[in-house]
Protein backbone atom coordinates (compact mmCIF):
# COMPACT_ATOMS: atom_id res chain seq x y z
CA UNK A 1 0.00 0.00 0.00
CA UNK A 2 1.51 3.29 -1.12
CA UNK A 3 -1.16 5.55 0.37
CA UNK A 4 -1.47 4.74 4.11
CA UNK A 5 -4.85 6.45 4.50
CA UNK A 6 -7.83 4.64 3.04
CA UNK A 7 -9.51 6.92 0.48
CA UNK A 8 -12.15 5.22 -1.67
CA UNK A 9 -11.17 4.80 -5.31
CA UNK A 10 -8.05 7.01 -4.98
CA UNK A 11 -6.21 4.50 -2.76
CA UNK A 12 -6.95 1.68 -5.20
CA UNK A 13 -5.82 3.69 -8.23
CA UNK A 14 -2.55 4.76 -6.60
CA UNK A 15 -1.78 1.24 -5.39
CA UNK A 16 -2.52 -0.33 -8.77
CA UNK A 17 -0.69 2.22 -10.92
CA UNK A 18 2.27 3.29 -8.80
CA UNK A 19 2.93 0.96 -5.85
CA UNK A 20 4.88 -1.58 -7.92
CA UNK A 21 6.95 0.92 -9.85
CA UNK A 22 10.71 0.91 -9.27
CA UNK A 23 11.84 3.31 -6.53
CA UNK A 24 8.22 4.05 -5.52
CA UNK A 25 7.74 0.48 -4.30
CA UNK A 26 10.32 1.20 -1.59
CA UNK A 27 7.85 3.71 -0.10
CA UNK A 28 5.03 1.21 0.38
CA UNK A 29 3.96 0.15 3.87
CA UNK A 30 4.32 -3.58 3.15
CA UNK A 31 7.60 -5.23 2.19
CA UNK A 32 8.21 -8.90 1.47
CA UNK A 33 11.59 -10.58 1.88
CA UNK A 34 12.15 -13.95 0.24
CA UNK A 35 15.04 -15.98 1.65
CA UNK A 36 16.50 -19.29 0.59
CA UNK A 37 19.23 -21.59 1.92
CA UNK A 38 22.83 -20.64 1.20
CA UNK A 39 24.08 -22.66 -1.77
CA UNK A 40 26.82 -25.09 -0.85
CA UNK A 41 30.15 -24.67 -2.70
CA UNK A 42 30.42 -26.66 -5.91
CA UNK A 43 33.01 -29.37 -6.50
CA UNK A 44 35.22 -27.53 -8.99
CA UNK A 45 36.96 -30.69 -10.16
CA UNK A 46 33.67 -32.10 -11.46
CA UNK A 47 32.43 -28.99 -13.27
CA UNK A 48 33.03 -27.99 -16.89
CA UNK A 49 33.11 -24.55 -18.50
CA UNK A 50 32.39 -22.86 -21.81
CA UNK A 51 34.01 -19.59 -22.86
CA UNK A 52 31.89 -17.81 -25.48
CA UNK A 53 33.78 -15.37 -27.69
CA UNK A 54 31.99 -12.96 -30.02
CA UNK A 55 34.13 -11.64 -32.84
CA UNK A 56 34.03 -9.60 -36.02
CA UNK A 57 37.18 -8.53 -37.89
CA UNK A 58 39.46 -9.68 -35.05
CA UNK A 59 41.98 -11.73 -37.02
CA UNK A 60 45.05 -10.54 -35.10
CA UNK A 61 43.56 -11.23 -31.66
CA UNK A 62 42.48 -14.83 -32.15
CA UNK A 63 45.68 -16.76 -31.42
CA UNK A 64 46.64 -14.66 -28.41
CA UNK A 65 43.18 -15.19 -26.99
CA UNK A 66 43.25 -18.97 -27.49
CA UNK A 67 46.58 -19.19 -25.67
CA UNK A 68 45.46 -16.94 -22.81
CA UNK A 69 42.17 -18.61 -21.85
CA UNK A 70 42.71 -20.56 -18.61
CA UNK A 71 41.60 -24.12 -17.98
CA UNK A 72 38.51 -24.02 -15.77
CA UNK A 73 37.34 -27.22 -14.10
CA UNK A 74 37.83 -30.60 -15.66
CA UNK A 75 37.15 -29.34 -19.20
CA UNK A 76 37.01 -25.96 -20.94
CA UNK A 77 35.15 -25.48 -24.21
CA UNK A 78 36.10 -22.47 -26.37
CA UNK A 79 33.29 -21.25 -28.62
CA UNK A 80 33.82 -18.57 -31.26
CA UNK A 81 30.70 -16.82 -32.58
CA UNK A 82 31.75 -15.07 -35.78
CA UNK A 83 29.73 -12.13 -37.07
CA UNK A 84 30.27 -11.55 -40.81
CA UNK A 85 33.95 -10.56 -40.70
CA UNK A 86 35.55 -8.91 -43.71
CA UNK A 87 39.09 -9.93 -42.78
CA UNK A 88 40.51 -13.45 -42.24
CA UNK A 89 38.96 -14.03 -38.81
CA UNK A 90 37.22 -17.24 -39.89
CA UNK A 91 40.37 -18.60 -41.52
CA UNK A 92 42.37 -17.82 -38.38
CA UNK A 93 39.90 -19.61 -36.11
CA UNK A 94 39.89 -22.65 -38.38
CA UNK A 95 43.68 -22.63 -38.23
CA UNK A 96 43.56 -22.59 -34.41
CA UNK A 97 41.21 -25.58 -34.41
CA UNK A 98 43.76 -27.57 -36.41
CA UNK A 99 46.81 -26.20 -34.59
CA UNK A 100 45.47 -26.94 -31.11
CA UNK A 101 43.56 -30.25 -31.36
CA UNK A 102 43.95 -30.74 -27.60
CA UNK A 103 41.75 -27.68 -27.04
CA UNK A 104 38.02 -28.00 -27.58
CA UNK A 105 37.61 -25.08 -30.00
CA UNK A 106 34.36 -24.63 -31.92
CA UNK A 107 33.25 -22.09 -34.52
CA UNK A 108 29.71 -20.92 -35.26
CA UNK A 109 28.53 -18.14 -37.55
CA UNK A 110 25.69 -15.94 -36.40
CA UNK A 111 22.80 -15.27 -38.77
CA UNK A 112 22.03 -11.85 -37.29
CA UNK A 113 24.24 -8.79 -37.13
CA UNK A 114 24.04 -7.58 -33.51
CA UNK A 115 26.05 -8.76 -30.54
CA UNK A 116 22.96 -9.85 -28.61
CA UNK A 117 22.21 -12.41 -31.32
CA UNK A 118 25.78 -13.71 -31.10
CA UNK A 119 25.65 -14.12 -27.32
CA UNK A 120 22.38 -16.03 -27.49
CA UNK A 121 23.73 -18.39 -30.14
CA UNK A 122 26.77 -19.04 -27.96
CA UNK A 123 24.64 -19.72 -24.88
CA UNK A 124 22.49 -22.19 -26.80
CA UNK A 125 25.47 -24.04 -28.30
CA UNK A 126 27.55 -24.21 -25.10
CA UNK A 127 27.78 -27.48 -23.17
CA UNK A 128 29.70 -26.39 -20.06
CA UNK A 129 28.27 -26.09 -16.56
CA UNK A 130 29.44 -22.46 -16.34
CA UNK A 131 29.11 -20.13 -19.34
CA UNK A 132 31.51 -17.19 -19.56
CA UNK A 133 31.10 -14.50 -22.22
CA UNK A 134 34.11 -12.49 -23.35
CA UNK A 135 34.74 -10.08 -26.20
CA UNK A 136 37.73 -10.89 -28.40
CA UNK A 137 39.41 -7.46 -28.39
CA UNK A 138 41.72 -8.40 -25.46
CA UNK A 139 40.73 -5.19 -23.67
CA UNK A 140 40.06 -7.49 -20.70
CA UNK A 141 42.74 -10.06 -19.89
CA UNK A 142 41.25 -13.56 -20.42
CA UNK A 143 42.96 -14.69 -17.21
CA UNK A 144 40.40 -12.59 -15.30
CA UNK A 145 37.85 -15.29 -16.16
CA UNK A 146 39.33 -17.27 -13.28
CA UNK A 147 37.79 -14.82 -10.79
CA UNK A 148 34.34 -15.47 -12.22
CA UNK A 149 34.86 -19.22 -11.99
CA UNK A 150 35.92 -18.91 -8.34
CA UNK A 151 32.90 -16.71 -7.54
CA UNK A 152 30.49 -19.24 -9.00
CA UNK A 153 32.11 -22.32 -7.48
CA UNK A 154 32.23 -20.74 -4.01
CA UNK A 155 28.56 -19.73 -4.16
CA UNK A 156 29.27 -16.01 -4.18
CA UNK A 157 27.19 -15.41 -7.28
CA UNK A 158 24.85 -17.11 -9.75
CA UNK A 159 24.96 -14.32 -12.31
CA UNK A 160 28.39 -12.69 -12.24
CA UNK A 161 28.80 -9.34 -13.95
CA UNK A 162 32.15 -7.71 -14.66
CA UNK A 163 32.69 -4.02 -13.96
CA UNK A 164 35.36 -1.88 -15.61
CA UNK A 165 34.67 1.24 -13.56
CA UNK A 166 36.32 0.27 -10.26
CA UNK A 167 39.99 -0.11 -11.17
CA UNK A 168 41.81 2.72 -12.88
CA UNK A 169 41.72 2.26 -16.65
CA UNK A 170 44.68 2.63 -18.92
CA UNK A 171 44.63 5.75 -21.08
CA UNK A 172 42.41 5.64 -24.18
CA UNK A 173 40.68 2.49 -22.96
CA UNK A 174 37.21 4.02 -23.07
CA UNK A 175 35.91 7.38 -24.36
CA UNK A 176 34.89 9.65 -21.49
CA UNK A 177 31.26 9.90 -22.58
CA UNK A 178 31.01 6.11 -22.64
CA UNK A 179 32.41 5.95 -19.11
CA UNK A 180 29.85 8.51 -17.92
CA UNK A 181 27.08 6.67 -19.78
CA UNK A 182 28.00 3.34 -18.20
CA UNK A 183 28.00 4.82 -14.69
CA UNK A 184 24.70 6.55 -15.41
CA UNK A 185 23.06 3.32 -16.53
CA UNK A 186 24.46 1.54 -13.49
CA UNK A 187 22.91 4.17 -11.22
CA UNK A 188 19.59 3.69 -13.00
CA UNK A 189 19.66 -0.11 -12.87
CA UNK A 190 20.54 -0.35 -9.17
CA UNK A 191 17.23 1.04 -7.84
CA UNK A 192 15.25 -0.48 -10.71
CA UNK A 193 16.38 -4.02 -9.98
CA UNK A 194 17.39 -3.80 -6.34
CA UNK A 195 20.87 -5.07 -7.24
CA UNK A 196 24.07 -3.05 -7.29
CA UNK A 197 25.44 -2.38 -10.78
CA UNK A 198 28.34 -0.09 -11.63
CA UNK A 199 28.80 -1.26 -15.23
CA UNK A 200 26.02 -2.74 -17.36
CA UNK A 201 27.93 -3.19 -20.62
CA UNK A 202 31.07 -5.04 -19.55
CA UNK A 203 32.22 -7.62 -22.07
CA UNK A 204 32.90 -10.27 -19.40
CA UNK A 205 30.05 -12.00 -17.60
CA UNK A 206 29.16 -15.51 -16.41
CA UNK A 207 26.12 -17.64 -15.62
CA UNK A 208 25.57 -21.36 -15.21
CA UNK A 209 23.95 -23.31 -18.04
CA UNK A 210 21.29 -24.47 -15.60
CA UNK A 211 20.32 -20.94 -14.60
CA UNK A 212 20.48 -19.72 -18.18
CA UNK A 213 17.85 -22.28 -19.16
CA UNK A 214 15.64 -21.05 -16.31
CA UNK A 215 15.73 -17.40 -17.37
CA UNK A 216 15.91 -17.80 -21.15
CA UNK A 217 12.18 -17.29 -21.69
CA UNK A 218 12.27 -14.01 -19.77
CA UNK A 219 15.23 -12.80 -21.84
CA UNK A 220 13.00 -12.77 -24.93
CA UNK A 221 10.96 -9.95 -23.40
CA UNK A 222 13.93 -7.63 -23.76
CA UNK A 223 15.73 -8.98 -26.83
CA UNK A 224 13.90 -6.75 -29.30
CA UNK A 225 15.04 -3.60 -27.51
CA UNK A 226 18.71 -4.19 -26.79
CA UNK A 227 21.20 -4.75 -29.63
CA UNK A 228 24.06 -5.45 -27.21
CA UNK A 229 22.52 -8.43 -25.41
CA UNK A 230 23.59 -7.29 -21.93
CA UNK A 231 20.30 -5.88 -20.68
CA UNK A 232 18.09 -8.93 -21.37
CA UNK A 233 20.53 -11.08 -19.40
CA UNK A 234 20.78 -8.62 -16.50
CA UNK A 235 17.01 -8.12 -16.22
CA UNK A 236 16.14 -11.80 -16.52
CA UNK A 237 18.80 -12.77 -13.96
CA UNK A 238 17.66 -10.15 -11.45
CA UNK A 239 13.95 -10.79 -11.97
CA UNK A 240 14.57 -14.54 -11.86
CA UNK A 241 15.93 -14.25 -8.33
CA UNK A 242 19.52 -15.17 -9.15
CA UNK A 243 22.22 -14.04 -6.76
CA UNK A 244 24.04 -11.23 -8.57
CA UNK A 245 27.72 -10.52 -7.95
CA UNK A 246 29.94 -7.85 -9.48
CA UNK A 247 33.65 -8.45 -10.02
CA UNK A 248 36.04 -5.63 -10.94
CA UNK A 249 38.22 -6.24 -14.00
CA UNK A 250 41.14 -4.32 -15.45
CA UNK A 251 40.39 -2.56 -18.72
CA UNK A 252 42.95 -1.55 -21.33
CA UNK A 253 42.98 -0.35 -24.96
CA UNK A 254 42.23 -3.04 -27.50
CA UNK A 255 45.28 -4.74 -28.95
CA UNK A 256 44.23 -4.66 -32.61
CA UNK A 257 41.57 -3.18 -34.88
CA UNK A 258 38.79 -0.69 -34.23
CA UNK A 259 36.23 -0.85 -31.46
CA UNK A 260 32.77 -2.01 -32.52
CA UNK A 261 31.11 -0.57 -29.41
CA UNK A 262 32.38 3.01 -29.71
CA UNK A 263 32.34 3.54 -33.45
CA UNK A 264 29.13 5.57 -33.28
CA UNK A 265 28.85 9.25 -32.57
CA UNK A 266 28.23 10.86 -29.18
CA UNK A 267 24.58 11.62 -29.97
CA UNK A 268 23.89 8.16 -31.40
CA UNK A 269 25.32 6.51 -28.30
CA UNK A 270 23.12 8.49 -25.94
CA UNK A 271 20.09 8.05 -28.19
CA UNK A 272 20.52 4.29 -27.83
CA UNK A 273 21.21 4.66 -24.11
CA UNK A 274 17.97 6.61 -23.63
CA UNK A 275 16.04 3.95 -25.56
CA UNK A 276 17.44 1.30 -23.26
CA UNK A 277 16.61 3.33 -20.16
CA UNK A 278 12.99 3.65 -21.31
CA UNK A 279 12.89 -0.06 -22.04
CA UNK A 280 14.31 -0.75 -18.59
CA UNK A 281 11.64 1.31 -16.83
CA UNK A 282 8.70 -0.12 -18.74
CA UNK A 283 9.74 -3.74 -18.91
CA UNK A 284 11.03 -3.97 -15.33
CA UNK A 285 7.46 -3.34 -14.20
CA UNK A 286 6.03 -6.01 -16.52
CA UNK A 287 8.65 -8.73 -16.07
CA UNK A 288 7.57 -11.24 -13.44
CA UNK A 289 9.80 -13.47 -11.35
CA UNK A 290 10.28 -16.99 -12.63
Q: Could you say what each language-model-derived stretch is?
A:
Residues 82-91:
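A conserved acidic beta->alpha catalytic loop
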Residues 58-61, 85, 141:
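Donor nucleotide-sugar binding loop of glycosyltransferases
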Residues 83, 134-136:
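Active-site acidic Asp-centered loop
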Residues 108-125, 130-133, 142-223, 254-270, ...:
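Acceptor/aglycone-binding surface of glycosyltransferases and processive sugar-polymer synthases
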Amino acid sequence: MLLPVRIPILSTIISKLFAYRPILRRLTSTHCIVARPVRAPENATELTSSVILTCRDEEENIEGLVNAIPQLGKHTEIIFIEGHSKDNTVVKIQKMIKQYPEKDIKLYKQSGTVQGDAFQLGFDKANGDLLCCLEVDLAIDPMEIGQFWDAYVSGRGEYINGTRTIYQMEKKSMPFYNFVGNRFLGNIFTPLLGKRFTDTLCGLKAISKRNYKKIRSNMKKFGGFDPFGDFPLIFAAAKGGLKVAEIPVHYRPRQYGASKAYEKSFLTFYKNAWLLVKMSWIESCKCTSL
